[in-house]
Amino acid sequence: MLSLFITSAVIIVVIQMLFFILAAYFKTDKVTDLSYGLTFVIVSWVIYNNSLSYGHANFVVPLMVTIWGLRLSGFLFVRILKTKKDKRFDGIREDFLKFAKFWLLQGVAIFIIMLPAIVGTAKDGRTFGAISIFGFLIYLCGVITETIADYQKFMFKSDPSNEGRWTNVGLFKYARHPNYFGEILTWWGIYIFAFTTLDGFEYLTVAGPIFITLLLLFVTGVPPLEKAYEKRYAENKEYQKYKNSTRLLLPFPKKIL
């Protein structure tokens, strides 16, 4: 198992460095998010081809990762083609070391998030019991939620009449960041699906879903958006009303839960 972790780490670093070279040379943001989802997909199938055993159950894990990864990469690529640039990299893409640091940290994040998927793909010691089914349903809810939320926000932002407005349609009527809720659910679902194969130190792969949860809640996801919205709409009473009447993540009316 250790060799598979090492193999995964090496592949992740190689992929990230290749995309970094492209992004740095052409001074482009178009490959950044594309590389993120694709790295998960590539690593999953490499691990499957080198897995400790082959079976129906461990085939499902890379399939789950692939559906999530290709969907996310495709969406982000279409979005960056429309927006032309990613504001996150303003002042960074021109600085070689800072830009390289971002790609390195992205590689580290991918490895940590992937931990349960690596084990779940490499081992086939389970049947499709209640835990696996529950995990798959959680995953499915996550992917569907993230897909719907991304589509709704993209379409809203694509409408010129919504210029300067915050997204408040569909799932966003109930939560300000339902897409992040979907992504968190996705990775907890993958961990739960793989749970019955875990043994000993492998239970520590729970670090994967914990990491993505904390990352989105406290670092790269929610905080910068909340800060930007608060700054932009600080004097807007309608936004403050919207903020106070919605949840942060969970896309349900407050009256329900």
Regions found by a protein language model. Give the residues of each.
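Juxtamembrane helix-capping/reentrant segments at transmembrane boundaries
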Residues: T28-L38, K84-F102, R165-F172
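Select subsegments of transmembrane alpha-helices in polytopic membrane proteins
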Residues: T32-L34, L97-I110, R176-E183
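A basic- and aromatic-enriched beta-loop-alpha substructure that forms the phosphate/nucleotide-
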Residues: A57-R93
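C-terminal ends of transmembrane helices
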Residues: M17-T28, G74-L81
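Short, amphipathic, aromatic/basic-enriched membrane-interface segments that mark the entry/exit
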Residues: S3-T7, A24-T32, K101, K173-P178
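Hydrophobic transmembrane alpha-helices
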Residues: L4-Q16, T39-G69, I113-Q152, K157-L257
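Active-site His/Glu-centered metal-binding helix of metallohydrolases
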Residues: S35, S73, V108, I144, ...
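Generic alpha-helical scaffold signal
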Residues: I12, Y25-T32, Y54-V60, T83
